[in-house]
Amino acid sequence: MKSSGTATQSAPCLPRYYGEVMGVLSDCSDSSEVLTGMRLARAAIGRGELIVMPTDTVYGIAADAFSPDAVRALVAAKGRTLAAPPPVLVPGIQTLDALAENVPDAVRALVAEFWPGPLTVIVPARSSLNWDLGETRGTVALRMPDDQIALELLNETGPLACSSANLTGQPP
């Protein structure tokens, strides 16, 4: 995957645009850059563009989960097809009921214990939602990252389709 700009290994970055659009790197470990980085990330998501954002496990490529074009761009950036739909990051447990239906009590107990954190749950997607994540077979993979910057961004943008910032088959 080609990217414009350079990455730093030591600090989370928001946003980092992949492809030929533009390269903007904000070091969100520097408090003077957080507001600018968040503003740029929100704007990029609003335009249907991809960003690279920190999560609690790896950097992720993220897109508006409700924008079919943005989700297709995310899947293409990963070198995948819609046969492998991306998980969706959420800002809080309350979003579980907004995006899923018929959530088993066992899943509710798991998210109560392990969210925020590196737990992804696959649950029945709410049938009334107007989104296209790919071949989900009526399910959605949801995760609430344990990263303050990610959660702040998710609170402002809403759910984001997100996958690790690497090509499929390559290390993150």
What positions do the PLM features span?
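Low-acidity, Ser/Thr- and Arg-rich intrinsically disordered low-complexity segments
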Residues: 2-4, 10
